[in-house]
């Protein structure tokens, strides 16, 4: 979960809805609820605002930010395996609806599309990409400096081949980003390939 401080003074808790009943997707959706710092409690009931930017499933780690006229939602998708990625959406209303970034995922180690929403194999080694030093790139958050430079910090791994074991576990990477003219976040080279 994360806390979002809007420019109008309101505060929101953004979290993952984890559904445990049979027949429901796990994890399911990103939810948001207003938070009152004076009362130190939530106001009302959580509302589903985002189901993800890809069909990779396993949505988690929501971050909400505001830049200019847009609210941006950034999430991890694809689980923590080789299908891991960072996705983004935006809306002019904090409650949505959020439009998917047309280039989702915005950061990944997996070239091309993958549709694994219902795949029980969370590591997904078939998506290992020998062209990339960084694997399992996902679960990110960005920062914009006063100079206008933008950086994304995200998780990744560097496996030993051919076993594809990552003995150092989840590592941290930082990558330079840029805002496009149409207000989408991209890697500085214009790609989505970590």
Feature annotation, model-predicted:
Residues 1-194:
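Carbohydrate-active catalytic/glycan-binding domains of CAZyme proteins
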